[in-house]
Regions:
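Exposed alpha-helical structural elements
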Residues: 4, 90-101, 107-115, 185, ...
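Generic amphipathic alpha-helical segments used as scaffolds and interaction surfaces in large
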Residues: 82-90, 102-115, 166, 267-278, ...
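A broad, structural surface signal
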Residues: 93, 97-108, 118-121, 125, ...
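Extended, helix-rich architectural segments
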Residues: 1-193, 347, 380, 396, ...
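Charged, low-complexity, helix/coiled-coil-prone segments
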Residues: 2-5, 31-43, 53-63, 215-229, ...
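Structured, contiguous alpha/beta core segments that scaffold functional sites
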Residues: 10-13, 130-335, 339
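C-terminal anchoring/interaction modules
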Residues: 2-8, 12-14, 303-590
Length: 590
């Protein structure tokens, strides 16, 4: 059944009401991240500028997101069903390369940090499938959505979003520039209200079969994009609504708005760092009291007794005492500063860190209270367990996203497309026709091979596995995260070893035998920048082989070093016409 404007307004009202609690929490988190604590805790402010304690909430969010995002996902595609094994494997390899190309086109490596921030801070990473509609052969890609703009309406039993809204406040001039000044929506609102407002709601609606875009009345005024403003209820009297794009079938295998709700005890959308806020609020409030106490102590008024001209008190003043038995007295009765309260502030900051498994060492404080390595291991273990939780959820979210991208590629792309990139460290270039290639099979599995570890720990684990013989050098390079093209790097490492053997062993031996010409030619080729060391080495080796092959059969054997023999044999055996060292030429010919 096609969505109507009245149905959209009903869903809009429901979405705003049902997501109100989570949007309030998102607003609070945004303001704490921006150090606008006076908007969150207005009764605990000394100044209107900055918090009084360390913003461990921001530190934890950025550190945890960066650590989790440092490990890139693995994309695995099973063989196609009902195909010969060789053809199925070939199609699976091409499917994987297409998925890799879609990930690169979505800038997933840079977007991943933002997705993890949304997971830790808001508990709702979200994206939308989109493409450049002016280019028929353009590749679809993921657009990361701000969680405060996403309003889930219905979820599937497996946790996928079935229906949702994207609600954003936008300027009228921007909407006209994007949708065109002749769009019927603007004409309809102008006729119904007699004017156009400065700000409007842009509402994207989507379910599993259709999507559409509408415009509606919004609170007026300009706020920063990070400040959440509750949308006007669509059911209020006088609200103006119209379709910017009429609802139409999107032909995808699910809702084009993609979101993943982080598991919580009460089923609400909430960030994993929310437990930090109560102790952080106490630390902030207590530190304000300590600051006020210190300020009173610094600016305490002097106490002047039995002084005749007390009103002249000040710099370089001469004071006269009152005659009588009492002595003149000038005192500074400052209240004692409660410095022990600073320890309570630190305790609350530590409680905020501990509530989300964020050791103080991660924030740059080495700490002096760690008595043993076991304590450090336990702290890091709690940190890593939450990282593993985030990566598991992100793998599930990515799997849904890539399946949706594959369907969009089949349904929305016209003609063939060339793709290129790196697959398991190997550069590739392929051409395929999306409408004929997918055939409704969008199966893909996204995983993280190093759950709960950061890039440094992952590198240490890969190195240890390589030393123990559990991994080949190429696989270790791929899992290290440092080598973009393991196949090319493996070749470079091998050639580097050969060049080192040439320079350190073969050339010195040839010079000792009196062959200084090869030595001179090698370094002249390098010094002139005409050849790389590897190319110069290969050229001179080829020259040596040709000289040996041109010698008559009864000539004395050439002076070939064991090192050169080893290098040549490793390249595919002895050159034709070159007898082994120590064997007469006649015997070699028999």
């Amino acid at each position: 059944m096609r969505m109507t404007l009245g149905g959209l307004r009903d869903r809009h009202s429901f979405a705003v009401q049902s997501n109100w609690n989570s949007k309030q929490r998102m607003t609070r988190s945004d303001r704490i991240l921006r150090n606008e604590w006076r908007k969150v805790w207005p009764d605990l402010s000394v100044t209107e500028s900055e918090p009084t304690v360390e913003n461990v909430y921001l530190e934890a969010a950025e550190d945890k997101a960066a650590s989790a995002a440092s490990i890139l996902p693995n994309i695995d595609v099973p063989p196609r069903r009902a195909s010969r094994k060789d053809r199925a494997d070939q199609n699976a390899q091409l499917s994987r390369r297409v998925f890799v190309s879609l990930a690169q086109n979505s800038s997933l490596d840079s977007q991943q940090f933002g997705f993890y921030l949304d997971w830790f801070v808001y508990g709702l990473p979200a994206a939308c499938v989109w493409k450049d509609w002016d280019e028929p052969a353009a590749s679809p890609y993921l657009v990361r959505l701000q969680p405060r703009h996403v309003y889930p309406i219905a979820w599937s039993p497996t946790g996928e979003l079935r229906e949702g809204l994207i609600i954003r406040r936008r300027r009228l001039v921007d909407l006209i520039d994007e949708y065109g000044p002749t769009n019927p929506a603007f004409i309809h609102i102008l006729k119904s209200k007699g004017r156009l407002d400065e700000m409007y709601q842009e509402v994207w609606w989507a379910d599993e079969t259709e999507w559409g875009m509408a415009i509606g009345s919004a609170p007026q005024g300009i706020w920063g994009d990070m400040d959440y403003v509750r949308p006007d209820d669509a059911s209020i009297t006088g609200a103006s609504w119209a379709w910017l794009r009429q609802p139409a079938a999107h032909r995808l295998n699910g809702c084009p708005i993609l979101a993943y709700k982080v598991t919580s005890a009460d089923g609400e959308i909430r960030g994993k760092l929310d437990p930090m806020l109560p102790p952080l609020k106490i630390a902030h409030a207590l530190n304000i009291e300590v600051m006020l106490n210190v300020r009173r102590s610094l600016h305490a008024p002097p106490l002047v007794q039995n002084v005749e001209n007390w009103d002249e008190y000040g710099p370089d003043a001469v004071l006269r005492g009152v005659r009588g038995p009492d002595d003149a007295q000038i005192a500074y009765p400052r209240p004692p500063a409660a410095f022990e309260a600073f320890a309570h502030v630190r305790d609350q900051l530590d409680a905020a860190r501990n509530s989300v498994h964020f050791p103080q060492q991660r924030g740059g404080n080495p700490g002096a209270s760690i008595a043993s390595g076991e304590a450090v291991t336990l702290l890091q273990g709690g940190y890593n367990s939450q990282q593993a939780h985030a990566q598991l959820d992100m793998a599930r979210f990515y799997t849904t996203c890539f399946a949706r991208l594959g369907c969009a590629d089949e349904q929305w792309t016209i003609g063939s497309r060339d793709i290129d990139g790196f697959d398991s460290g190997e550069a590739f270039t392929d051409t395929y026709t999306p409408s004929a290639f997918w055939k409704g099979d969008y199966r893909v599995l996204v995983t993280f091979g190093a759950l709960g570890v950061d890039a440094h720990t992952n590198l240490l684990n890969a190195g240890a596995a390589f030393r123990w013989g559990w991994l080949s050098s190429r696989t270790a390079m791929e899992k290290s995260g440092m080598v973009p093209n393991a196949l090319t790097e493996e070749r470079r490492v091998s050639m580097g070893r050969a060049t080192k053997l040439w320079e350190e062993m073969i050339l010195p031996t040839m010079v000792e035998k009196g062959d200084t010409e090869t030595f001179r030619q090698y370094y002249e080729m390098i010094d002139s920048n005409k050849e790389t060391p590897t190319a110069a080495m290969l050229g001179l080796l080829d020259q040596t082989v040709k000289k040996a092959a041109a010698q008559p059969q009864n000539a004395p054997p050439p002076q070939v070093t064991p090192e050169l023999l080893s290098l040549l044999s490793g390249a595919g055996g002895m050159p034709q016409g070159m007898p082994p060292q120590g064997m007469p030429a006649g015997m070699a010919a028999q």
